[in-house]
Curated annotation (Swiss-Prot):
Designated gene of the protein: spaK
Keyword GTP-binding: no
Role description: Required for surface presentation of invasion plasmid antigens. Chaperone specialized in the storage of effectors within the bacterial cytoplasm, maintaining them in a secretion-competent state, and allowing their immediate delivery to target cells upon contact of the bacterium with the host cells. Has been shown to chaperone IpaA, IpgB1, OspC3 and probably also OspB.
Keywords in alphabetical order: Chaperone, Plasmid, Virulence
Similarity field: Belongs to the SpaK family.
Taxonomic superkingdom: Bacteria
Coiled coil regions, renumbered to chain: none
Record's keyword annotation contains Secreted: no
Pfam families membership: Invas_SpaK (PF03519)
Subunit details: Homodimer.
Family annotation (InterPro entries): Invas_SpaK (IPR003065)
Name of the featured protein: Surface presentation of antigens protein SpaK
Amino acid sequence: MSNINLVQLVRDSLFTIGCPPSIITDLDSHSAITISLDSMPAINIALVNEQVMLWANFDAPSDVKLQSSAYNILNLMLMNFSYSINELVELHRSDEYLQLRVVIKDDYVHDGIVFAEILHEFYQRMEILNGVL
């Protein structure tokens, strides 16, 4: 995956989605690219170990809320995400946040149209998790 231009990939996918060029600020491939959203956590995109990773940080729920939502969270985690290297989304927990994460298969990171589909599907998973939490 050495020849990926992450900035161009993200820019092309945002144009495909319909984002006006005026709101796409200078993108930098030396750090995570952040797509800020109005009513949801930001989507972060970066190359990690030469693979494209997407993640979003949700406020960490209480243990009680996490336990009461476990069934719905498990269903979300078991939904197929065909663009991912393991065909699933991952969920990581820390004291501050619950992180929804996916590492994208190399085959899908060279086309802005395909990457727009990935962003859309990841956003749909974010909506599900947000509704559960």
